[in-house]
C-alpha cells in the first residue's frame, strides 16, 4: 500500500490503483476535452476533484458535475464526459 497525493500529480492521466476487481484513474481534462461516447463491462464512478464536467448518457440522462460531486453509474450505458473548464476527476471502473 502507498499513499498517493492527487494534488501532486502532474500528468493528464495516472493509474492510481489496478487489480483484478477494479481500477482507479486520475484524469486532467482541458476545457472542451474529455472522453467520446464509450462503455465499460460493468459499473463505474466519477468524482470531480476540481472544475466542472458534463456527463451525458445515451438514455438521455445528463449531469453537470462540479468539484466534490460523486456519481456512481452503470457504465454499460454509453456515455461521454466533457470538461467545461480545466478539470480533474477520479474514475473507478469495476471489472
Question: Which residues does each predicted region cover?
Answer:
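Short beta-strand segments in beta-sandwich/barrel cores
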Residues: 25, 34-35, 51-56, 70
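A cytosolic small-molecule/anion-sensing beta-strand core signal
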Residues: 49-50, 66, 85
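Glycine- and acidic-residue-biased ligand/ion/polar-headgroup-sensing regions
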Residues: 42-54
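Ligand-binding loop in jelly-roll beta-barrel domains
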Residues: 75-95
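A short glycine-rich, His/Asp/Glu-containing loop-to-beta-strand
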Residues: 2-33
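Short histidine-centered beta-strand/loop micro-motifs
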Residues: 15-18, 27, 35-40, 57, ...
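Short acidic-glycine-tyrosine-enriched beta hairpin
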Residues: 59-75
